[in-house]
Amino acid sequence: MPAAPFSVIIPAHNEGNVVRRCLEAVYRDAPQDALPEVIVAANGCTDNTVAIARDAAPLARVLDLPVGSKVIAMNEANALASATPRLFLDADVQCDYASLAATADVLRQPGVMAASPALRMDLSRCDRWVKAYYRVWLTQPYVTDRLVGSGLFGLSREAVERVMPLPEVIADDLYVKESFAPEERRNISKDCNGESCFFVVYPPRTAFDQIRVEERRLRGNIQLARREASGNKNRTRVRFRFRYTEELKLLDIAAYVIIKSAVRILYRINKLRGLSDEWTRDEGARAG
């Protein structure tokens, strides 16, 4: 069998409801002579994630790690992976082979360290508050300035040597993004043939779940800021950019501000209650 052109690492903690669709997308239309090396790093699972992953992707290597830690799972899988470029894909995200391969191609270019396909949000099952929130979020500099992360990031061989193994952080994707200068990152929307490259994220369905997930992201951002107190020139600056347009209504901006304010309040409450290290994720978007 020929060497794999790239590796795909999928950390998964109790992702039995979604890991099949993730794996089916990874292998969709993949040529038999260029199959990726796929490692599913199931960690601390108490559901059927491992069994479903093995059934959905017989060619993948499925780890059954005892500790429920995304970062540890990514590091364990990375230590076993043999191919580069190396792409790290959340189990609740979908990205097809063509987009993964196009990202890997970009990562072979000189000077490119980290890359992601274009981000698409599936808001079809979200309430009006969440839809309004993401209409604003998608216009913010974090997303528009060479986004790497939010469910998928790829690393070149040199980048793997630079950032792996990852430290124990909440915001692993932000840590990776900030490890590279803007000119070292790429966000690609088209492959060399002009075909669309993207991955699909399924955000929380309700405003309440969105607030809980955003509070975890805030904790991750604050944790990174404290780690990098000595200064990081690649640090993502929190900048909000609001401009009323035909697509972006004042009500959208209001919803965004309200949710962000609620996130800050929840963060302070959790800190007072000693819950600042508790892992939070959205279960609604993972439901069938």
Predicted regions, residues:
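A conserved acidic beta->alpha catalytic loop
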Residues: 25, 39-50, 67
